[in-house]
Every structure is written in structure tokens, then in C-alpha cells.
Amino acid sequence: MSPLIYYAHSAQDKLGNLLPYKHWQTLQSHLVNVGEMAAEFAQVFGAQEIACQTGQLHDLGKYSEAFDRRLHGGSSVDHATAGAKIAVERWGNVIGKLMAFCIAGHHAGLANGCGEGDNRSTLKQRLALQFDEDIPALYNLWQQEIKL
């Protein structure tokens, strides 16, 4: 069963103890805010809409049980590949892959498209990962909270 509220970031006190949920940032607010900021930055070159959607997809993998466990001290989770996969599914192999490079690399930096990299997976390898096998399955609520 999925939680009613998804969170992007937890909050801790000075001793590292988790603070109550009211101090945490909701995932919906985080994705909307990042989308808005990305659109502002992209205005200078006229790509506001695609930048907004890229920003909204960058942490889509946080809509998962595995990431909820991460927020409570569990192991790290690939939360970027899900958004990269959705971008390619929705916008295809040109715009979608440009978005996917940004989304998949938002922590580790841009990956190679398909050639060997510096101990990082390529975008091609990441896009081949399967939901609920290689990366966490997404809760469907993301489609109601994030309007693409």
C-alpha cells in the first residue's frame, strides 16, 4: 500500500535524529518548484516548457516504496532513472533523450550515450533497466500529483 504523502527530503535535528514529517519537504512541492526554477533558467533560450517537465521528472523515482525506506535510513536508491525512462517514453528519442541525459545525470553528471564511461553506466544502459526488476516500481499517484 502506498503512503498518502510522498516526501522528497527528510529533515534532521543537529544530532541527526529525524524530525517529524511536518518538517519534511513533500515530493510534489519539490518537483513543482524544481520545474518552475528550470523553466525560469531556460527562458533565456526559449525552452521553458521542456525544462519545466524535465525538472518535474528529475526525482520521479522517489515515488517508490524503496525511496520511502531510504528516507527512514535505508540504503540508497536509483531515483533518477525512472524519470529518464518516462521522458523517453513520452517525448521520444530526440527530445526525450535530451531530457533523459539531464534527469539521469542530475547527481552524477552527464553519462555517455552508449560508449564506455568512467565506471558509470551509460544512458543506454540506464534506459534498459526495468521497473520492479532493476529499479523500483513507481506508485501511480505521481500521475495525479505531477501534470506533464
Describe these PLM feature segments:
Residues M1-L148:
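Accessory nucleic-acid engagement/destabilization modules that flank
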